């Protein structure tokens, strides 16, 4: 249930007001991102989440709640409470592995997701690319970065092959291997977009695995594999710019050196693929 309040509350206030019988537990799912913790009562567990990006508008967090409210429980956690800066969702029991599942199994999960009703809001990458440029460290802004940004702005985003609800952050850490099948967590980037954008954004280990995932998906979706792969490739420069910009943005936000290393690695990939 959504609970409207303009006044932020503390963790203790949240628990005492809405979950008085629950208590925090110390075991965490490795797939959870920062700002999340588990609560438990008589074997029932919930995940209490906060926005990953403290500077993001509250509307982005609310959209995540709305997306989870629309999705079937067989692929995503069911939400129970939303209020400012807090969301409570089901804990998904299972294993979070360090590698992706079989490509055919993952293709089946993504194809099922893409058959669901659309969320109602579009994913557009250009505003994000421009935001990350504006919010990055001025010392890190280069002529090459600006040149690539202008090139994408002029080219415009690829026309969607098929418009569907997307997760947009599919990697091993966001996949729960449960007894009932694969499920996805961390839906903060969800929205409607091109199925090829989703496939392009999957954090794969190598090109061979990526091609196999696209081929397996194409079989289910009854699309020519070569056609789908061409569309996936059209999204590559957009996604690499998105990743690089996000790492730069997070570096300025947190000062964490890992983001500089990830940004530098992504810029190198962009130069190679040009």
From Swiss-Prot:
Domain of life: Bacteria
Gene3D superfamilies: 3.90.1200.10
Signal peptide: none
Known EC number: 2.7.1.89
Keywords noted in UniProt: ATP-binding, Kinase, Nucleotide-binding, Transferase
Family as reported in the entry's similarity comment: Belongs to the thiamine kinase family.
Record-given protein name: Thiamine kinase
Organism: Shigella dysenteriae serotype 1 (strain Sd197)
GN (gene name): thiK
